[in-house]
């Protein structure tokens, strides 16, 4: 049998699409002003909308490197959809302790309970039209999770984020009274 016969039936793994973003943040509420050069891997099963919500979550939490960890930490993108045990974003201090675990979308109860056991604080950024229904079903099961915060982003706004998505992006965000 030739070499091509060995490869028959072997599925080809799809690769993530790489996006580069320069994000200028002016967080007036926290006195945080910075520029971040970021690389985002968009998993083949991830939508651009979800990827852009991850970028928004980064911008909303960039100040935590200084306000929570006095600069002794890093906020980074996790494996996300590629690894269900890894957050979409993680703030880890230099001892390796996870100070903030960020999920995007509608994670299940088990994932949020596991995240709460591994991090000081867990934030979920829900954005789809079905997020309210998802939360009404999952909230009673998570009533003991004091570390958990839910942020509901309007789906009309998150869909508009897709118009900004490009393989190379330069974005500015001003945060005030948020």
Task: Give, region by region, the residue ranges found by the protein language model.
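Extreme N-terminal leader/targeting regions
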Residues: 2-50
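Acidic-basic catalytic patches of nuclease active cores, encompassing PD-(D/E)XK
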Residues: 29-81
């Amino acid at each position: 049998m030739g070499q091509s016969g060995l490869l028959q039936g072997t599925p080809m793994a799809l690769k993530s699409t790489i996006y580069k973003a320069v994000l200028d943040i002016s967080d007036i509420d926290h006195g945080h002003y910075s520029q971040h050069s970021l690389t985002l891997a968009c998993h083949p099963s991830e939508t651009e909308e979800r990827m852009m919500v991850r970028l928004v979550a980064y911008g909303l939490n960039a100040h935590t490197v200084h306000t929570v960890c006095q600069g002794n930490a890093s906020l980074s993108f996790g494996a996300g959809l590629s690894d269900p045990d890894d957050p979409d974003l993680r703030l880890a201090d230099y001892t390796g302790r996870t100070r903030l675990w960020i999920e995007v979308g509608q994670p299940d109860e088990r994932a949020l309970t596991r995240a709460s056991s591994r991090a000081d604080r867990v934030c979920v950024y829900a954005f789809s039209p079905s997020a309210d229904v998802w939360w009404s079903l999952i909230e009673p099961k998570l009533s003991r999770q004091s570390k958990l915060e839910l942020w509901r982003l309007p789906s009309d706004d998150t869909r508009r984020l897709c118009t900004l998505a490009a393989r190379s992006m330069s974005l500015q965000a001003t945060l005030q009274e948020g």
